[in-house]
Amino acid sequence: MKRSSFHLPATCAYAILSLWGSIATAQIDNSTPEWKKEQTRGQMEDAAAQAAVKTVKVPKEVKVNVEMDKPRGVMAPWVMAVQALVSDAHLSDPDVIQLLRSAGITTVRYPGGRIADTYHFSAYRPSNWQGLDHPNVGYAPTNDLGSFSRFMEQVGTTIFTVNYGSNGAGTGPGDPAEAAAWVAYVNGNPTDTKMLGKDSAGNDWQTVGYWAGLRGAAPLPSDDGKNFLRIQHPTPFGIRYWEVGNEVFENGYFGGEGLEEDLHVPYPKEAKENAKQRKKNAGLAPEAYGKNFVQFAQEMKAVDARIKVGIPLDKPLAGQINRDEWTQDPVTGKYQQNASVSVKEDFNKGIDWDKGVLSTACNQVDFVSLHWYPSDTTQDSGYKDLDSYKLLAAPQDTLRAILAGLVDQLQKNCGQRARSIQVAFTEVGVAPYVKVPEQEEVVLGLFAADLYPQLVEYGVINADWAELHNGGFLDNRNKPGAPYFGMQMVHALMNFNDALVAASSSSSMLSVHASKRADGSLGLMLINKDAKNATTAKVQVSGDKLAAMGMRFDYGKTNPPDVRTVRGKAMEGLSNSMSIPMPPYTATVIVIPKAQ
């Protein structure tokens, strides 16, 4: 089934909106639908209302209000996503594609995180890693670009992360000509004679038609090393989103080990010399990345002007700082950590990186990429065991702070251009070293179920759960984990191009999301975040008259799924005013048709 070409309604604009009631990156003009203007004006009030009441224990009754005539966001085709690694030996397992479809997944990020900056699509081998913290992953034999392209086409689409950090020989940085050749292979026309030129190492990257021709060709009887690219697919795949480099801000410019491979400056032979050679080196500076990004974007778009090219940003945590520990300079806007605080952090690093990159590259940036692990001990309170309460609060609390900081950065550094810049979370999940007790695994599913609709409401176009395998989504036997079932619940709530509608809860311990589906039916999601206490949701729905029969889906502590599926069951007695019992640690989706 070919699903890689999505057709969007002309009125849909997938861009991040301000959380504070002003325009951020949403395109609001005379051509914008009235509901979209209303979304921008009303979003802050609705988000603030949900976060207003913060309790640890859910009340016995919670008031839920749904307004079906007030859209609050449209699900972009790329939102429901996972990250796949070239090292994943189970990516090509026969049942993976059906599992992804069952969870509503339409997008798979490739080739992964740090490995992307040593990955070379035309050779399917990494350049020699020279950084100080090797990612220690291999290449599975069935995950080359040709094989992945066939896989991706059956799932839906992808976001590619091209190599910024290293050339094929491992003697210098990634090159725009190689990235342009990758675009040519995936999206090019075999008759296109445009020359791609030579890279800094002298490699000739031929023409657009050369790479597109490889894609359409049959394998040679005697393999010349390129047969893995010959997949007999003459039609371009039409992949839209391309990211230049992975977490480039970790290249050592701000000190540390230089976790991301970036050979724009050579690595020292001795690790102890790393800080001296790389810290504050102009070749690794955010302005240098911004300048190089512009060249990447221009050469890639010269192959296919329809693509969108994005940059990784450090996570802008405005609003997440403990004000007892930090003081903000009213003139510079920089933060100073108080001397009495024992655990020191460089909060300003992310501000400096994002400002430098955006001020240099804004005119070519189509989207920005963030990575978010709300359980990460280096980014939150320092816990090593899962803090379930904090994780379940993150979609309404921490996420709003992150996006508020991002909106601020975009407005300050990109001006009017900020209106058209989209936002992707190309990695999201729970840090792998956080301990998750077996009895608490359900929390990961509730978090995923809550997170994805919230991202849709905020205008985010993509969120890649990390990882497809061994990130809680699937294990190595392809047994689904809690995040998988959480995303199944989102899939029950809505599909891409369905609209979220206004929904509010009187308690922060009961999340609510609602959708108006393509057939006019209501999708209602309720999530009880209390581990011990049940509640009853007193639901009032306006804007359309509902039928008395619907389907109910439950996932949670007392409602374990089948081996692979959260199954729905018929529900009677529904109306525009109804009471829904909610057990502890449970997500419920109710789909109710319009009354006839």
Locations of regions flagged by a protein language model:
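N-terminal substrate-binding region of glycoside hydrolase catalytic domains
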Residues: 31-57, 63-146, 151-174, 181-228, ...
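Noncatalytic carbohydrate-binding groove/subsite architecture in carbohydrate-active enzymes
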Residues: 186, 203-228, 260, 276-443, ...
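Loop/turn elements at helix/coil->beta-strand transitions in domains of secreted/extracellular proteins
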Residues: 76-80, 103-108, 153-159, 237-241, ...
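Carbohydrate-binding surface patches
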Residues: 507-546, 585-591
